[in-house]
Amino acid sequence: MRAITFEAPIPRYLVTLAAGKVANAFHVGAHACTRYREVAAPDLPSGDWVRIRTRLGGICGSDLGIVALEASPSASPFSSFPFVIGHENVGQIAELGSEARDFAVGERVTVNPLLCCEPRAMTPPCEACAAGHHSRCTHFTDGALPPGMLLGTTRSLGGSWGEEFVAHRSQLVRVPDAMTDAQAVLTEPFACCVHAAYGSMPAAGETVLVIGAGTMGLLMIAALHALAPKAVVTVLARHPFQAAHAMQLGASRAVPGRGDYLAELADAGRARLLKPILGPPIGVGGFDRTYVCAGGSRGIEDALRFTRSGGHVVLLGNVSHARVDWTPLWLKELTIGGTLAYGSHVHGAASVNAFEEAAHLIASGRAPVGGLVTHQFPLADYRKAIATARARGGSEAVKVAFKF
C-alpha cells in the first residue's frame, strides 16, 4: 500500500534537519525522515482487531511538527519506528478479526487512536485506564504492541496517512449515515476539545479567552458553545478568515492577533493594563478562563497576562520548547494545566466519554464543524497538502485532509 512514513536514523535526521533549514520542502522526500512510499499493509495483531480502509486522513498540527522535526525528544519513547503518520481518521472496515463480529465489513467508522491498556491486552488495566482516564495510561510502551501512544506513531499498525490501518475493536466508533466523512474526520481533534472543556468547564456567565483560531481553537469554541453556551467567549485570531469561522461557531468577539492587539484584548477581558519597566504590559482583571490552542511562548504569555487573578489557564497546543516569563502565574495565583487527548468525565450523575460525546455532538448538529475541512488532496499530492496546511494565512486552510 502507499503511505507516508516517518523514521529518523541519525544520518537521515541530520540531513533532514540541515536541508529543512534551507526550505520546508526538504522536510519530505526520498532522503528525508518523512517519505511517500510503498509499504506492506499491516497485519491484524489478534482476533480483536479490524482492518480499515482509509477514506479521509487529517493533517494535525502535531503531524506537521513530526514532519518538521519540531516534536520534543521527550515524546520519543512513546513512539516506535518506522511508523505511518496520521491519527485523525475516518474509514471503512475491510476485514474483521475472529473476535470482532459485532461490526461488519463495509461499515464506516472513526477510530479513537489511543493505544492504552485494552488494545495492548494489559490485564488488569492500569489505575488510570480503570478509571476511564485513558490518556494517562501508564502502559503506552508495554503489552502486546510496540511502544506508541497513538495510532500514527506506532510501527506495524499503520496510520491514516496510508491506504489502510488496523485498530482494536474497542477503539471503533460507528459513523452514522447522515454524517459526512468531513464531519467524521474531525471527531478526534474535536474530542480533544470536548475533553478540555469537561476538564475545565466554564460556569454560566464566565468570560473565556481562546488563544488561536486554527483547527484546535475553532473546535474549542464549538465545544464551549455546545457544552457551556452561557459562557462569553473571545477568540484571539491571527487571520480574518479564522475570525469569521470563530464567530460562526459561537464566539462573541474576535480580536485580531496581529500588530498591537493588547489594548483590544484588555478591553474584551475588562482588564486594566499596567506597563512594567521592561516587557509587555500585564493585565489587572481579565478573563476567568483561558484555553491556549496556539501561539507557542507568546500564546502562553498572553494567557498568563490576561487571565484574572485566581483564574484558570488550559494548554491544548502541544507546546514543547517555550521561553515564558512565569511571573504572572504566581503573582495572580493562576491555576494552569495541560490536557491531552480524551477520556471519561463525571458530569452530573453520568459518566461521559469525550470521544463518543464528540461524535454525538457532531452527528446531532450541536457542533456544526464539517465546514472546517477546507482542503482535500490525494495522497500522491502530499507535498502540496503539507505546504497548504503550513501556509494557513495564504491558503485560508483550516483542516487539510488526505482523500483516498
Per-range role (PLM):
Residues 1-7, 11-18, 280, 284, ...:
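C-terminal capping/lid region of NAD(P)-dependent oxidoreductase domains
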Residues 1-88, 163-164, 403-404:
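Short N-terminal strand-loop motif that marks the start
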Residues 6-9, 200-204, 210, 221, ...:
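Glycine-rich cofactor phosphate-binding loops and adjacent beta1-alpha1 units
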Residues 172, 176-264:
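Mid-domain Rossmann-like dinucleotide-binding core that forms the NAD(H)/NADP(H) cofactor-binding site
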Residues 267-280, 284, 323-373, 383-384:
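C-terminal substrate-binding/catalytic core of Rossmann-like NAD(P)-dependent dehydrogenases/reductases
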